[in-house]
């Protein structure tokens, strides 16, 4: 005889169990939930994804240590739960008001795009509060965030960080060793940018690789003034991004605040310099970007360092500049648990 047995869990469901008596059917149902040890082998796994609500990716590297997703950062982050070890953000500076500058001896327009047009202080504050609140929800309790800016936006960012409960650790001054000249000759040449370093929690301790930073600074404590060059031509082999950051800056802050294998988020991925630096240093990366042009450029940059000679060239350049100490086998090897533990496809 076939009996319908109701099993009450968080939700009730009915299964069909073939048995001679009601008691036998109930016993069979209970046996489905007995405690037991299960040992799985490779043959028990199938090539599938164990997620119903996975977020589709624009691109994933062959070993899944570099993922790009197309979409607005706030909207995309609302679709999944995941805790990152570190965040780097290069949000709009809101400075593209038709100004000019000098690059390679030529006068050029400094407009970056419509996304960087000046706005009101109130709108800037609301924008920064919105994306910072969203990112904070996806940071581990001991995670830190780095945010770059200039005087145009950095004070707004600082105020929103405090409002959300972050603890500001440092404000790094990036002093560019090769800044473009000021062609108006009416004020000092802009040669610096600021990078706020903050941790999510006031009380939970963060990670700081103090010894490595000291080693990279000739065994002296590293200060909050970093004298590093602006982006070099060798970093633009896959195209030009109007606000691309140099690998040297990203490599330093990634090493300072994460361990190998850490997950790093960039909500304004751009040309994915954060991701390239992360992978060169054995970290994993998720970048969010809305522009197809920049997604394509980022994909090309990541594919470029699949070439061992190109990867070695990048590492040697960074090592020569005393930004990193070369390591062997610096690409991350992914485990099955890690593959199915992320909420993107």
Protein language model regions, located:
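A short, exposed loop/beta-hairpin motif centered on an aromatic-Gly-Thr core
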Residues: 12-20
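PRPP-dependent phosphoribosyltransferase catalytic core
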Residues: 293-345
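Short aromatic-glycine-(Arg/Gly/Cys) micro-motifs in beta-strand/loop hairpins
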Residues: 1-11
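Short polar catalytic/cofactor-binding loops
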Residues: 9-13, 72-75
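Core catalytic lobe of class I
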Residues: 56-297, 343-345
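A short, charged, amphipathic alpha-helix used as a generic interaction element across diverse proteins
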Residues: 21-37
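Short, mixed-charge low-complexity intrinsically disordered segments
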Residues: 35-56
């Amino acid at each position: 005889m076939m009996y319908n047995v109701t099993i009450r869990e968080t939700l009730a469901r009915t299964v069909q169990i073939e048995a001679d008596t009601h008691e036998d059917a109930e016993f069979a149902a209970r046996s489905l939930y007995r405690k037991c040890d299960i040992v799985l082998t490779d043959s028990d796994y199938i090539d599938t994804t164990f997620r119903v609500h996975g977020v589709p990716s624009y691109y994933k590297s062959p070993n899944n240590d570099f993922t790009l997703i197309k979409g607005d950062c706030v909207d995309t982050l609302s679709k999944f739960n995941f805790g990152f070890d570190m965040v780097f953000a290069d949000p709009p500076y809101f400075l593209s008001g038709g100004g000019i500058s000098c690059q390679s001896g030529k006068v050029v327009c400094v407009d970056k795009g419509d996304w960087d047009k000046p706005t009101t202080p109130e709108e800037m504050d609301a924008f920064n509060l919105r994306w910072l609140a969203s990112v904070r929800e996806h940071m581990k309790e001991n995670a830190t965030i780095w945010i770059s800016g200039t005087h145009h936006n950095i004070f707004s960012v600082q105020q929103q960080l405090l409002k959300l409960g972050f603890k500001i650790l440092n404000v790094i001054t990036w002093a560019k060793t090769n800044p473009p000249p000021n062609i108006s000759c009416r004020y000092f040449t802009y040669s610096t940018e600021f990078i706020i370093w903050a941790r999510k929690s006031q009380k939970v301790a963060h990670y700081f690789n103090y010894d490595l930073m000291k080693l990279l600074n000739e065994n002296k404590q590293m200060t909050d003034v970093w004298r590093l060059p602006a982006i070099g031509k060798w970093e633009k082999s896959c195209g030009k991004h109007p606000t691309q950051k140099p690998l040297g800056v990203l490599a330093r802050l990634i090493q300072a605040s994460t361990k190998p294998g850490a997950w790093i988020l960039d909500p304004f991925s751009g040309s994915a310099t954060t991701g390239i630096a992360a992978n060169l240093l054995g970290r994993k990366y998720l970048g969010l970007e809305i522009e197809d042009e920049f997604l394509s450029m980022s994909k090309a940059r990541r594919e470029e360092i699949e070439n061992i000679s190109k990867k070695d060239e990048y590492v040697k350049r960074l090592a020569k500049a005393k930004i990193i100490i070369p390591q062997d086998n610096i690409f991350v090897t992914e485990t099955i648990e890690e593959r199915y533990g992320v909420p993107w496809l």
